[in-house]
Amino acid sequence: MGKEDIRSLIDELSSPLDLSNGSVGIILAAGHGKRIKSEKSKMLHEIWGVPTVVRVRAALDGGLDNSAQIVVVGIKAEEVAKSVGKDENLKFVVQEAQRGTGDAVKIAMEAIEGADFSGDVYIVPGDMGLIDEHTIKSFKESFETSKADMMVLTGEYAGDPENNQYGRIIRVPKNFNDGSPAGSLAGEVAEIREYKDILAMKDEEPYEVKHKGKIFVLNKQDMLNLSEFNTGVYAFKDGSLKEHLESLTTENVQGELYVTDLIKIFNENDKKVHAANANDSRLVEGFNLKSTLREMEAIARERVYEKLKDVITIEDRYDFFLSDEVVDRIFELDEAGKAGDIHVHKGVSLGPGVHLSEGVEICDHCQLTGTVYIGPGTNLGERVLISNFPGQEIKIGANTTILNGNEIKGEVKVGDN
C-alpha cells in the first residue's frame, strides 16, 4: 500500500477518543525488529495464539479501565493496524520514519493536541506479549500514589549480564566515588543508559552521571553489570510530558530520539521521577530473537497449566495448547461443577472457537479449530482433526467416540450416542 492508502486505512480504523476518565495509553508498535529475522512485523508474532500487540492492547484496556488508546504504527502499518482492528476509543497514528521511541511518542501526543486533557499518559511497547492487566493496574496505582511526574516500570534481569540487551537503570549509589554518603539521594533513578550506547563505550571510559548537583562515575562494565532494566513502560503527567518532549535530542549512537532521555531531563528540571519494580520480570520482557519468543511462549504455557492443573487433567504440561477463550470456558464449567473430568492428552491444540463439556477426553495430538461443540462424555481418539470455515459449526453429541485419525470438516452435526 502507498502512503495515501495507509493513511486512508488508518483513518478508517480509528475512532474518536474519549479522554474523560483521566488517562490515555500509547502503544509503540512502529518497529520491525531486524534481529527476529522475519518478514512479519515483530508486533504480529504470536504469544499463545495471539499477536503481541493485541495482547498489549488487551492489557492496557483492562489495566487502565478502558481508557483511550493510541497505537503508533510504522513498518508493516497495514498488517499491524488490521490485526488490532477497529474499536471504540482507539486511534492509530503513523510514524513514517523510524526516528526512535521519543519521536513515536511525539506523534502520538499530536493526536490529542488541543484536546481538553490534563491527565496521565501511559506508554507500553507493542512487543510485550506477556504483560497482563494486573501488571498495568499495579503500575497505575503506584504512579497515582507516588505523586511523581514520571514513573518507569523496571525489571530484574536474572541471566548472564552479557545477554542483557535492555537499557540499564542507573540509580544514585549509597556512597559517591569519593566515599561521601549520598544521603537522601541514594536509590533515586538518575537516568537510563541504552544498551547500544553502553556497548559503544571504551572499556575503561568514565561516564559521569550528574544528579541534583552531585556527580558519580561509572564505566562500561559497571553499567553492563547492572541487573535492573528498563521495560519500556512509562507513566507521565500529561503537562510534564508535553513540556519536555521537545528537549529530546539525537545525541546517541543510534541518532534517534529516546524516551529514556526524559528521565535525565526531568531530573534536571526538578521534576519528580520514580521507578516501580515489576512483581514478575518475565511478564515485562520484550523480544528481539526467535529464541526469546519461544521462551515467552513456554512461560505462557506454564501460566495456563498453573491455572488449570487442579481444574482439569492435562497429561503433558509441556505440550498442549488451549486458547484463552477455551480456558475461560473451562473456568465457567468449573463454577458449575462440570470441569473435573475433562482430560487433555499430549499435543492437543484447541482453538478459540472450541466449546468443551463435562467428561470430555481428547487424546494425543488432536487439533480442533473453528467453531466446535463437543458434547458431554465424548472421546476423541488420537490425531483427530476437526475444523471448519467462519460461519460453519460442528456439533458432536454426548457420549460419542471419534476413532483415531478421523477428520471432520465443514458444517457437521453428530448426534448423541
Predicted regions and their residues:
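A residue-level structural signature of the nucleotidyltransferase/glycosyltransferase Rossmann-like core
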Residues: 121, 128, 233-234, 285
